[in-house]
């Protein structure tokens, strides 16, 4: 479902973007979790991949339910322009709605995750064991 949304949305998005993350292993999720904790860098997630899982991780149906994206500014990656992330996220949410696929944007969360989009209700779907 998420692939359908991205394929349609990327055609007429207000800004060019590309997917940077999709399905993640628990090990990789934990590496991201360690940023800003045991490794240098800013905290980028509250999900450690083992106790608290991310919707990027595989669910029982074999799919991840989240993606991260980055705004493209020519050939450069623009990680910092909130308004561009908001515009692309709004567009993704609208395309999802048109296709009957409800999405959530990480920019609406208390812990802001502007490059993150996931299928609404993904937290209720069991993870693969």
PLM features: residue spans?
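Active-site acidic/histidine clusters and adjacent loop/turn architecture
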Residues: 1-18, 84
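Short, well-structured alpha-helical interface segments that form or flank functional binding sites
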Residues: 4, 27, 87
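Residue-level signal for well-ordered alpha-helical scaffold segments within enzymatic catalytic domains
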Residues: 8, 31, 91-94
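Sec/Tat-exported extracytoplasmic proteins
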Residues: 13, 36, 96-99
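Acidic helix-start/capping segments at beta-turn-to-alpha-helix junctions
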Residues: 19-32, 111
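Glycine-rich loop at the start of a catalytic domain that most often binds anionic cofactors/ligands
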Residues: 31-39
């Amino acid at each position: 479902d998420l692939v359908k949304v991205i394929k349609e949305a990327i055609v007429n998005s207000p800004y060019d973007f590309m997917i940077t993350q999709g399905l993640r292993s628990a090990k990789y999720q934990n590496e991201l979790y360690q940023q800003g904790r045991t490794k240098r860098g800013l905290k980028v997630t509250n999900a450690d991949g083992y106790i608290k899982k991310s919707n990027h991780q595989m669910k029982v149906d074999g799919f991840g339910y989240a993606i991260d994206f980055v705004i493209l500014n020519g050939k450069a990656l623009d990680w910092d322009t909130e308004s561009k992330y908001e515009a692309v996220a709004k567009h993704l949410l609208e395309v999802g709605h048109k296709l009957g696929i409800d999405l959530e944007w990480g920019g609406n969360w208390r812990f802001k995750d502007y490059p993150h989009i996931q299928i609404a209700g993904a937290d209720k779907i069991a993870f693969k064991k």
